[in-house]
Amino acid sequence: MRSEEEMQSCTDSEMEGGEDETSGFMDESAISNPFREREMRGMIGDFEYIEGKWIGSYRFVKQLGTGSSSKVVLGRDVRSGEKVAIKIIPRRVNGGETGDMEMRCDQRVFREVIISSVLNHPHIARLKNFLYSPTHYFLIFEYVKGRQLYDIIISSGPLKEKEGQRYFRQLLSAIDYIHRNSVVHRDLKIENILIDENDNVKLIDFGLSNFYDNKTLLNTFCGSLYFAAPELLQGQRYCGPEIDVWSLGVVLYAILCGCVPFDDEDVQGLQAKIMDADFKFCKTISREAMELIRGMIVAQPSSRMGLSQVIGSEWVNKGQKSRINSYAAKRYPIMKLNEKYIRPISRAIRFQFPNMEREIRRFHKICREEIGTLEQIYWSRRPVVSLYYLVSENLGGDDENEAYTDDGEEEPPQELPEAVHDFVRFMFSKEKGCGPRHVKKEVFLTSTSQDSLCSVKGKDCGLPQVRQTYLKGFFKGIRVKHIGSHNALKKVLLDIFNANNIIYEITEKSYFCSAYHEDLECLFKVSMYFNVLLNEYYLTVTPLNSERKVFRNVYEWISSGLRNRV
């Protein structure tokens, strides 16, 4: 029996038969007005879901797969004739003591719907509609005619390196795209990778995906055991991208060797092998491929290759004329907010980001005040900002889009399923346009330079402040001995920054900084305090993203620089 992860896949043999029952298309007028009104809200009655027959206006062709919590059917929209893959998830409506668990399960569905509707990438299967009944959720995806990578490996064995490289590059393109948009997949495995009829990769099943923020760690165990990173088995908190890199390493091993790197008849034995990253190559492959896999399947996350290192690796680029294209749009500072975008997305995602609207407006304020600052770039990587950009990129930033209107009146609160459906409907209300247009000048939210950021606002007006405190120094902070004044402390810090190629930006209360080590970027801030009781200066160095290995180096650079100053 197939698993639910095959949701968009159907082999050629599965396509044969079963077509006659849906061969005639139904005219839209034949669909009852009450149904059409409910469908506008995403709600369908239980009587409009007949198991094995139809869901609203979608007629079943055949079942594709089942799992512990859902099943997937191949369907056809009787109004357009379009084939779709429909993921059917029972709603948990028991109530009582299991209420929190039910809420989390519902939120996971809503998150999958939102993520799958905003991601727009040639190697990611996209959600097209979302419906719900009192007892079920229905996620309608684009239909991908093809085969699972799992089936290809099982039937044909390991792939040749040239073919495997092509598929892996397409997969890396998709993962780079989602990571750039603050999304981590968390369930990468060969069952969730389809090869379509044009021999291209389609990544599916974002049911375990989540948004990640470099400041907030995740702690949920996700994914298949064979592809799960050691830190998941150990119950450690994680940022997100690093577990996708581990899974990518296991996927590449399976592609080139025809089996998984870790296996054992005993579950405890399997877990022990994974946690030790204890594996051998069961097949001879190229030196470059082995080096890449060994760099990805590393037990310690801080020693594991980052995705950018994987993309730039020798094997991935061997024989290629160009680097991998992530299809991520160039992003400009938001100089003008499109109010029509803010409300539908903030309503739909309020279960995870209740302050989304406020954060978007804060980022907008930062964009208008200063162009190309580190603080602006840092904020542009936050999930809520990525969501706003994704919506704008899909809808083209067009102020004339009237799909969502705001008459200024306070609307009654929506139930979450209806708000999520409204957002999906809003996303597909218009053909994809161009990127955001409200731009003052050609400034991209990408890389930064020492020259552009080291002499920004505040250098000549006493900023950043050295704040007075009664507590700093007792419990935390780097003690600065024998420094005479505020200005002397700032001069020492700037000397340390310059000596270690630390890019900095002066803000009101701190230095907002960026440092690179082995192609990894660490964002952090340095704040200065004067302890009134101790009559001494102290610094705090606070990490702003998850590159802990680089941050440890940064902390040592600053603390040793203060100790060894002339």
From Swiss-Prot:
Its main location: cytoplasm. It is found in: Cytoplasm; Cell membrane. One of its GO terms (cellular component) is plasma membrane. SUPFAM superfamilies: Protein kinase-like (PK-like) (SSF56112). ATP binds at residues 64-72, 87. GO terms for molecular function: ATP binding; protein serine kinase activity; protein serine/threonine kinase activity. It is a peripheral membrane protein. Residues 13-22 have a biased composition (Acidic residues). Its EC number is 2.7.11.1. Serine/threonine protein kinase involved in regulation of exocytosis. Belongs to the protein kinase superfamily. CAMK Ser/Thr protein kinase family. NIM1 subfamily. This is Probable serine/threonine-protein kinase KIN1 homolog. The gene is KIN1.
